[in-house]
């Protein structure tokens, strides 16, 4: 199920994004400051280029690029 980013509390959204951008393998040696990486994800969410997916089975949220989201969830 897709979760509209603007329906999350601000602190919850920030923590979700920070968790995503600080995971192993997501920085690829990028020395960009955390605040900048968080801002980029926020902008992608606002533009519809990224989405928050809640997996009912695992009870976890994931941030996905638009092309990674199952098509049936975007319709």
UniProtKB/Swiss-Prot annotation:
Signal peptide (residue range): none
HAMAP family per the UniProt record, alphabetical: UPF0270
Taxonomic lineage from the root: Bacteria, Pseudomonadati, Pseudomonadota, Gammaproteobacteria, Pseudomonadales
Family (UniProt): Belongs to the UPF0270 family.
Pfam families, A to Z: UPF0270 (PF06794)
Gene3D superfamilies for this protein: YehU-like
Name of the protein in question: UPF0270 protein PSEEN1465
């Amino acid at each position: 199920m897709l979760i509209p980013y603007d329906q999350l509390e601000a602190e919850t959204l920030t923590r979700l994004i920070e968790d995503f951008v600080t995971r192993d393998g997501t920085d690829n040696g990028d020395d960009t400051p955390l605040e900048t990486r968080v801002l980029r994800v926020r902008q992608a969410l606002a533009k519809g280029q990224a989405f928050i997916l809640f997996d009912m089975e695992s009870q976890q949220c994931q941030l996905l690029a638009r092309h990674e989201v199952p098509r049936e969830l975007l319709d």
